[in-house]
Amino acid sequence: MAKSVNATGFITYMVIFLILTGISRVKAKKPPCLEGRTAYVSPGPCSNSLCTQDCRPAGYHTGKCKVEWSTPICKCYGCRKV
C-alpha cells in the first residue's frame, strides 16, 4: 500500500510539473522582433522624452539622449518589430 501511495504522489507531482512547464513556455513566447539599438544626432534639445517619441514610430521601445563630444545623440533601445 505504501508503494502505491508514493507512486501516485510521484505521478501527481510529475503531471503538475509538466503542466506548469508547458504553461510557462506558452507565456514566454513573444512576437517576432529584432533586439538592438540605433543612434542618430538629435536636431533639437537633448531630452529622453523627445528621443522616445522619435524612436517609437521606428518600432523601438524607448530612447535616451546623451551628449557626446558636444553633440546631442539620441539612442533608441528595445525590441524593434519585424
Curated annotation (Swiss-Prot):
One of its GO terms (biological process) is killing of cells of another organism. Residues 1-28 form the signal peptide. One of its GO terms (cellular component) is extracellular region. Belongs to the DEFL family. Keywords: Antimicrobial, Disulfide bond, Fungicide, Plant defense, Secreted, Signal. The keyword Aminoacyl-tRNA synthetase does not apply. Disulfide bonds join C33-C79, C46-C65, C51-C74, C55-C76. It comes from the Eukaryota. Its main location: secreted. It is found in: Secreted. This is Putative defensin-like protein 191. It comes from Arabidopsis thaliana (Mouse-ear cress).
